[in-house]
Amino acid sequence: LLALFGTDPLLNVDRDFQCLQSLPDVNLKTFATTSASDIVNRLNLDSPDILYISGHGASVEYENDRDGIIYLNPQTPLEISTLKAEVKKAVDCGLQIAIFNCCSGLGIAHQLSDVNIPYLIVMRAEIPNRIAQDFLEHLLSEYSNGTDFVRAFQLARDQISISTECWLKF
């Protein structure tokens, strides 16, 4: 499992890290990323089965396209389209699951839809960090206990609700 964390002092990723670190039988490699080349290098070096990226995110609409942006730090936006080829290589080398714990991730999903990641999770809207972390904990707890990934996703999603709005749709 390769976990990449954006470096924003306003974003608390300690709980994400603790959740990932507590997984049984997982070779966890983590680092705070500051550039696109960091991500490319880590994908090429580590060939992960699972990719987890946490940070601020946004979706951008263009005339005929949509892109997702991850903010590696408050001043460094990274368009997912620039990483698409590297993510495809990672899929070809065994990447099975990608979780983007970033707000407004539909642009990320759009850019990576034809890369054929077996399981891609994005947050479709802006959600509180605590809710995203609750979802991650439930998902990984179920999955690490042997639940099928799709079912683990459904169970985690079902446990998360904010008033009457459902933040996570399958």
Which positions does each model-derived feature cover?
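Active-site-proximal C-terminal subdomain of hydrolase catalytic domains
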Residues: 92-170
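Mid-sequence, gly/pro-rich, charge-dense loop/helix-turn segments that line enzyme active sites
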Residues: 65-78, 89, 145-146, 155, ...
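Caspase-like (clan CD) cysteine peptidase catalytic core
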Residues: 71-104
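Short amphipathic alpha-helical segments, especially helix-boundary/capping motifs
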Residues: 58-61, 83-86, 112-117
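A domain-level signal for caspase-like cysteine endopeptidase catalytic cores
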Residues: 1-77, 111
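Secondary-structure boundary motif
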Residues: 22-25, 45, 88-92, 145, ...
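Short hydrophobic/charged patches on amphipathic alpha-helices used for structural packing
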Residues: 39-41, 84, 88, 109
